Amino acid sequence: MKTLSSGGELASIRNRIALVDPTDSPLWGSMSAPQMICHLRDAFRCPLGERVPPPFKATLLPALLFKWLALWLPMKWPPGVRTPPEVDQRIGGTPPRDFQADRAGLLATIDQFARGTGPWAPHPMWGQLTTVEWMRWGYLHSDHHLRQFGR
């Protein structure tokens, strides 16, 4: 299973982020490429305790089942999952400013996250996660949005 605790997978995600262009169009969803860069940084800042979104509940599946399926089912995350307002760049997330600076900030935050061992802030839907679970989430969330922009 791919995680950000693997140096090779972390390098792969970093390289894919470097390929994102501010003019890239999404293959799904309504986020722009600059918004996606800021969204990912905001999301990585949550387990680091730098952003604290309010808890929210899964609507279709119990949180523990949803967590297990999302993290360990061997399939890619599907398009169309709604973004919580606190990390939606059009509502409560950090708005894009300077693309190169925003991307550099994301890369620095991912590096900080990948070096981490906790303690971690709780996930807003799934509660406390282990370091292994957070590293898996980090890979999957990044991969999902990079695929959204063909990267």
Over which residues does each language-model region extend?
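Globin-like tetrapyrrole-binding proteins
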Residues: 1-7, 17-19, 85-97, 106, ...
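Charge-rich, low-complexity N-terminal segments
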Residues: 2-5, 9-29, 35
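Membrane-proximal intrinsically disordered regions of secretory-pathway and membrane-system proteins
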Residues: 6-7, 106-110, 139-142
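Charged catalytic carboxylate motif
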Residues: 12, 39, 105
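Short, contiguous alpha-helical
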Residues: 23-72, 112, 120-151
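Short, helix-capping/interhelical loops that line the mouth of catalytic, cofactor-
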Residues: 48-105, 113
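Short, flexible active-site-proximal loops enriched in glycine and acidic residues
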Residues: 79-80, 118-121
